[in-house]
Amino acid sequence: VNSKANNWRFLCCGIAILAFVSGCGNADNSSAGFVRFDDGTPVRSGSVEFRSVADGSRYASRIGTDGSFTLTDQDGEPRCPPGEYEIVVVQIVLTEDLAADAHQHGGTVPRRYADYYTSGLTTTRGVADTTPLLVTLATGDE
């Protein structure tokens, strides 16, 4: 009888661990992507935000120095559900105390991309879409 109880506990622990491990991470990468200028260079600093056209929910991320990002919801969970989105890219660069050759923020994002009304950036994610999100900004566009 005692060995049956131990087997049952072992099975329950195994199921719990399997459920925990399989729920971790974002295996489909549906919230990952890149922000680049139209000449192919990455946006090296700032943040990106996607706003759902359907319900206004927002998914945001900081932009890595290689232009990469992973969108998260307001609870910090990496995700970007299927749907249509408006996009903004915001970059605040504080450089008044630096010489021009010491700036490491890369190309400057034009101000119009920081506002949903002027950015003109949109995307649609399908249900099974796991391709990386790509946000492209026009260079020299003010």
Task: Identify what each model region corresponds to.
Residues 1-22:
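Sec-dependent bacterial lipoprotein signal peptides
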Residues 24-142:
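Beta-strand-dominated extracellular/periplasmic modules and repeats
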